[in-house]
Amino acid sequence: MSCEELEIVWNNIKAEARTLADCEPMLASFYHATLLKHENLGSALSYMLANKLSSPIMPAIAIREVVEEAYAADPEMIASAACDIQAVRTRDPAVDKYSTPLLYLKGFHALQAYRIGHWLWNQGRRALAIFLQNQVSVTFQVDIHPAAKIGRGIMLDHATGIVVGDRKSVV
């Protein structure tokens, strides 16, 4: 996915969020915090993942630092997330907005968290990768080993109970 295509996906998400906030004022602060205050998809993703996966052991701010470190080192993860958003938007008839996976779909969240764990695993930070895998499993009921290999443009529909082992590939 080119930078231009990534910008198109992000601009669609922000436009949808503005419309959604106008249509449902009770959720306006939610849309602002999760999407509208962020400059790019990576920032929104890091905010969302950090808040979903935080725990007393690892607060959201610490998780967000790790996610942002990974995105800075490998921006292709953000492009992969945009491809995943497009895949969900194209393949799932129940999804009519680009913002839906980012806001609500735990399969999408689990997949993006896996990408961070996979990066950590490949950096030799295996303890943190396994910790993150466990948080994903507890939070989303999705268990993807950080050593697994997963491509882009992936949709994990509903996602509950999905298990991908360390020697598996999903393309």
Language-model segments: what does each one mean?
Residues M1-Q135:
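Terminal amphipathic alpha-helical/low-complexity segments used for targeting or macromolecular assembly
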Residues Q133-G165:
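A mid-sequence, solvent-exposed acidic-amphipathic segment
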Residues K168-V171:
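Conserved small/polar residues in nucleotide/adenosyl-binding loops
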